[in-house]
C-alpha cells in the first residue's frame, strides 16, 4: 500500500517464518533436507479520509462524548460541554445538526435555547432553537482556519442543561441538545 493521507498505520510488526521440506526419501527417520527462513512485514492501516456524517446510531459510543445512551436514533447531551470528534481535512464546511426530537421550550418556560458551537476550542457560532426550528436541522458555516490538519477535530456543543423531570416527573436526568446526526457539507 502506497502512502496516502487517507490511511494511517496503527500497527506494525514483522512475522517470522521458518519451514523445512520434511523430505525423508523413504528412510525410517525423517530428516529435513532443506530449510527456509524468512520475514514478512505486517502493517494494519486505518482509513481516516474525510468522514462527512456522524450519526448518533453509529457513533454514540466512540465519537460522541458527553452524550447519554442512544434513544431510538439520537442521544441527548448530558453534559454542558458535549463533543463529537471528527476526521476532516481543512476546508470550508456547512455543519448541519439534525435534532432527534423537540426540546420542550414551553414547559421549560423559555422562548428559545442557545447552543454555542466550538470547533477545536474556538467559538464557531451559535445555534438558536426556537418554535420555528425546534426538532429540525440547524446549520452553521465553519472556516477551514478552525480545523486541524492531520488530526482529529472536536466539535463541542455548549448549552444550559434542563431537568427532564419538568416533562417526565420520574426522570432525574439533566438534558441539553438531542443530536441525531452531525453532517458536513463542503462549501
Regions found by a protein language model. Give the residues of each.
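C-terminal luminal/periplasmic domains and tails of membrane-associated envelope-modifying transferases
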Residues: 1-187
Amino acid at each position: 500500500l502506497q502512502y496516502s493521507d487517507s490511511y494511517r498505520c496503527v500497527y506494525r510488526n514483522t512475522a517470522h517464518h521458518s519451514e523445512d521440506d520434511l523430505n525423508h526419501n523413504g528412510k525410517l527417520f525423517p530428516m529435513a533436507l532443506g530449510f527456509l527462513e524468512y520475514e514478512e512485514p505486517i502493517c494494519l492501516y486505518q482509513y481516516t479520509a474525510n468522514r462527512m456524517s456522524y450519526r448518533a446510531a453509529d457513533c454514540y459510543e466512540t465519537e460522541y462524548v458527553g452524550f447519554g445512551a442512544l434513544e431510538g436514533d439520537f442521544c441527548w447531551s448530558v453534559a454542558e460541554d458535549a463533543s463529537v470528534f471528527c476526521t476532516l481535512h481543512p476546508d470550508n464546511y456547512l455543519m448541519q445538526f439534525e435534532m432527534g426530537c423537540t426540546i420542550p421550550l414551553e414547559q421549560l418556560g423559555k422562548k428559545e435555547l442557545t447552543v454555542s458551537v466550538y470547533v477545536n476550542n474556538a467559538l464557531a457560532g451559535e445555534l438558536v432553537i426556537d418554535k420555528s426550528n425546534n426538532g429540525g436541522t440547524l446549520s452553521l458555516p465553519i472556516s477551514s482556519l478552525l480545523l486541524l490538519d492531520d488530526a482529529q477535530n472536536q466539535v463541542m456543543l455548549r448549552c444550559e442543561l434542563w431537568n427532564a423531570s419538568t416533562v417526565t416527573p420520574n426522570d432525574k436526568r439533566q438534558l441539553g441538545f438531542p443530536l441525531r446526526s452531525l453532517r458536513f457539507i463542503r462549501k
